[in-house]
C-alpha cells in the first residue's frame, strides 16, 4: 500500500496539498456562525445525491409526474426516506443560506477586498431560491401546479416584455407540459451546474482571501 501511495506522492505531491488544506490559519474570533456556509454546502451535496437517486423513477410528464412521486414514496425501497431527506435538506439549505447571508452582512464580510465573494454569494442565494421554486412544481399536484401558475404569471406586470417573458417561462401561453419540462431541466441540470460553478468560485476566493476579521 505504501508503494502505491509513494507512486502518487512522487507525481502529485499529495502531502503538500494536504498540508496546505489543513494548515490554513483560522482567526480566534471565528465561532459556530461561521460554519453556516459549510452547512449550506453539505445540504447541497445531500440534494445532489438524493435528487440523482430520484431521477431513476421520476417521470417529468403532466400525466405521470404525480404517480411517479407516489411510486417513489410507496414502492421504491427507501424511496420515502430519500424523498423526505431531499425535502428536509432543501428546507435546511434555504434556511442556512438566509442565515449565512445575514451573518456575512452583520459582520461586514462583504467589504473590501471581498466584494466579489459577496457577489457570488448573492448569486448563490438567488440560485437556491430558484431551486425551491422549480422543485416545488415537480410533483405536479394541486399545490405545485398553482404555485407555478402564480410564479410564472408575476412577470406579466412588466411593461412591453411581460407577456413574452411569461410565455418563455411557461413554454406556451398556459401552464402545461412545456412548463414542467422547463422546470425539470432547470432543477436537475441548469441550476446544479451553475451552483457548482459559483460555489467553486466562492470557495476559491475565500481560500485566497481568508476569513474576514472582526468588526
From Swiss-Prot:
UniProt keyword list: Chloroplast, Electron transport, Heme, Iron, Membrane, Metal-binding, Photosynthesis, Plastid, Thylakoid, Transmembrane, Transmembrane helix, Transport
Residues reported in the UniProt entry to bind heme c: 35
Record: residues binding heme b 1: 100, 202
PROSITE patterns associated with the record: CYTB_NTER
Top-level taxonomic group: Eukaryota
The keyword Iron is assigned to this record: yes
GO molecular function, one term: oxidoreductase activity
Disulfide bonds: none
Cofactor mode of binding and number, as noted: Binds 2 heme b groups non-covalently with two histidine residues as axial ligands. Binds one heme group covalently by a single cysteine link with no axial amino acid ligand. This heme was named heme ci.
Record InterPro entries: Cyt_b/b6_N (IPR005797), Cyt_B6_PetB (IPR023530), Cytb/b6-like_sf (IPR027387), Cytochrome_b_N_euk/bac (IPR048259), Di-haem_cyt_TM (IPR016174)
Membrane-related topology note: Multi-pass membrane protein
Entry cofactors: heme b; heme c
GO CC terms of this entry: chloroplast thylakoid membrane
Residues passing through the membrane, by range: 32-52, 90-110, 116-136, 186-206
Similarity field: Belongs to the cytochrome b family. PetB subfamily.
Protein name according to UniProt: Cytochrome b6
Organism listed in the record: Citrus sinensis (Sweet orange)
Highest classification ranks of the organism: Eukaryota, Viridiplantae, Streptophyta, Embryophyta, Tracheophyta
Gene behind this protein: petB
